[in-house]
């Protein structure tokens, strides 16, 4: 409970002059050595009717002098108990400390308010159960470097604690203490600073890490080069442009950066270096972009740096496109408003040679490729499976399919490819009924293209049709064979004519 005097003192905001010195003293509003004190609002104190101080500063001074009554008064005026403890520590007023410390209970709450390292240490000692490690940890939090300067030697040999404090200082970004620990104590894992710098994206911390590393090794040290390379890879992977530039100050290869920048589509990094590197490197980057399935903007940036000229490495490019099944660059070159570069057929040929049916169909849909073109390529490359599947999909009607396959044979020069298509036609006719006209047309077609075995098979089938018309057809085929020196076709036609003559009544 407050006394009547305390209630008066707590709530008195009136001027003190009319009260006289005696009343002021009786009210406890006189601060010995300083003069009268008056409350000004909730946060300030007027001393001797002249000086205005923050209440927490006033209670700190009063506590340092050991003036318990004035301390009590200022606490009534919403002064801070924590600053009272600080003042008592400054004046070594242990009676006051003993009286008020229990109301706080934990000295660590006060530490951030203390600027003087000696008082800081005294405050920490109030908790008798605390260790040196606790003192150092709070010194890091509160940037109290003098604590390390005073007791740092006690850490020598304690590798675990040194590492713990070093990493804590890095996480809290306390650069002064990081420097002191790094240069004065043996930190067995200095590189921990870089991991923390990457996570916090703190370039100052990152630069400080190199300063500490270079205190131990030179830039030509193999270990240092390995560290730089790892940093460049990670920084460029994450798109940390400033970190990349910082690492390159100490060494490393720009190529390392560029390949990661392409892979992860960091165009800011790429644009900074792209015009400073040789064409051969750009070509490798484009191939890497295909492998990494880079974005449209990344491809355009790379291609524009070589003016979209891909001829010198077009074979490698096509190989990469087909191998990694990524066709964006083909599309970009085709979409150019001027000087289009059409690699659709070239890529298609490699796809037909090496890829699966599904991959080829996807490409056909993407670039609106005519099925005939694919079937003819498949025939040249002896891809029987593709001929069958693609022609079946393109022309469901069997007679329609035969018609298109015949057209392809007529326009092909590749002998083996033509034969393969004709055998495909023959396989279709094996389970398709042909009328007289269709059967005769197909027989003549085989004769024109010197398909001896197929011609013989069709001749056998044609005997079921009108013999007179068939004989006329055979004479046409014989004429064709003689004109082109198709000896086996001529022999077969001649034999069939003789047989018809033999069995036909005269």
From Swiss-Prot:
The keyword Repeat applies. Keywords: ANK repeat, Early protein, Repeat. Coiled coil: none annotated. ANK repeats lie at residues 54-83, 253-283, 313-343. It holds the Pfam family DUF249. It comes from African swine fever virus (isolate Warthog/Namibia/Wart80/1980) (ASFV). InterPro entries: Ankyrin_rpt-contain_sf, MGF_505. This is Protein MGF 505-9R. Induction: Expressed in the early phase of the viral replicative cycle. Plays a role in virus cell tropism, and may be required for efficient virus replication in macrophages. Belongs to the asfivirus MGF 505 family.
């Amino acid at each position: 409970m407050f006394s009547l005097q305390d209630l008066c003192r707590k709530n008195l905001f009136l001027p003190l002059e009319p009260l006289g010195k005696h009343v002021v003293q009786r009210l406890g509003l006189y601060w010995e050595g300083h003069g009268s004190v008056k409350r000004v609002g909730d946060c300030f104190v007027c001393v001797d009717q002249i000086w205005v101080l923050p209440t927490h500063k006033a209670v700190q001074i009063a506590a340092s002098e050991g003036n318990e009554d004035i301390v009590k008064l200022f606490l009534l005026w919403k002064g801070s108990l924590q600053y009272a403890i600080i003042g008592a520590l400054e004046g070594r007023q242990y009676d006051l400390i003993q009286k008020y410390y229990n109301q706080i209970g934990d000295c660590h709450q006060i530490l951030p308010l203390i600027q003087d390292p000696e008082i800081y240490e005294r405050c920490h000692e109030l908790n008798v159960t605390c260790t040196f490690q606790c003192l150092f940890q709070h010194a890091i939090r509160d940037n109290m470097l003098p604590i390390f300067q005073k007791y740092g030697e006690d850490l020598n040999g304690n590798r675990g604690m040194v590492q713990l404090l070093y990493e804590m200082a890095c996480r809290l970004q306390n650069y002064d203490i990081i420097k002191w620990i790094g240069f004065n104590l043996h930190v067995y894992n200095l590189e921990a600073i870089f991991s923390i710098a990457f996570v916090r994206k703190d370039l100052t911390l990152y630069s400080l890490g190199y300063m500490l590393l270079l205190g131990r090794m030179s830039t030509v040290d193999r270990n240092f080069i390995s560290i730089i390379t790892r940093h460049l890879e990670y920084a460029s992977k994450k798109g940390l442009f400033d970190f990349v530039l910082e690492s390159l100050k100490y060494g490393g290869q720009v190529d390392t950066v560029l390949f990661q920048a392409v892979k992860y589509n960091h165009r800011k990094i790429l644009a900074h270096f792209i015009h400073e590197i040789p064409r051969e490197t750009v070509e490798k980057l484009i191939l890497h972009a295909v492998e990494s399935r880079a974005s449209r903007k990344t491809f355009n940036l790379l291609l524009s740096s070589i003016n979209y000229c891909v001829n010198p490495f077009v074979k490698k490019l096509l190989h990469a496109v087909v191998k990694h099944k990524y066709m964006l660059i083909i599309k970009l070159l085709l979409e150019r408003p001027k000087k289009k570069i059409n690699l659709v057929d070239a890529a298609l040929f490699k796809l037909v040679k090496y890829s699966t049916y599904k991959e080829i169909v996807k490409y056909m849909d993407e670039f609106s490729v005519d099925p005939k073109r694919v079937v003819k390529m498949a025939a040249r490359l002896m891809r029987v499976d593709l001929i069958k599947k693609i022609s079946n999909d393109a022309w469901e009607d069997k007679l329609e399919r035969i018609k298109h396959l015949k057209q392809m044979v007529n326009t092909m020069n590749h002998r083996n490819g033509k034969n393969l298509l004709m055998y495909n036609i023959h396989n279709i006719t094996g389970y398709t009924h042909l009328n007289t006209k269709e059967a005769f047309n197909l027989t003549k077609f085989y004769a024109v293209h010197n398909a001896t075995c197929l011609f013989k098979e069709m001749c056998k089938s044609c005997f079921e049709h009108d013999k007179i018309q068939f004989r006329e057809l055979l004479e046409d085929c014989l004429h064709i064979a003689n004109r082109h020196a198709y000896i086996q076709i001529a022999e077969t036609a001649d034999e069939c004519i003789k047989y018809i003559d033999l069995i036909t009544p005269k």
